[in-house]
Amino acid sequence: MERYVTRPGVVLCSVCGEYLLVAAKEAREHCPYVTQINESAASYWKLLDRPYSIDELTERAAEVFQKEKKDLLLPILLFIRKLEKSGYLIGEDENDA
């Protein structure tokens, strides 16, 4: 099962009501220096305090935001895919760990 974790050296910042992911130090080798994300994505990012599978992250988000898992699955999938593709998230296979 693949789990996702934030790339070390990437921080979430809030500037004038906008959410930005900023890559510092070595993280810049793997992702753009800065990207803007929406409020929902920022909320999901804050939940990634350790590696989570998509199902685990969806479960945690449902508990925290008091929403149905089925309503969160697609937004979380899109969040994971976009940020993994751009390098801000790292996918780790449990079998490789």
What is the predicted function of each stretch?
Residues 33-97:
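Long, charge-rich, low-complexity alpha-helical segments
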Residues 1-46, 91-97:
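Acidic, low-complexity/disordered tracts enriched in E/D and polar residues
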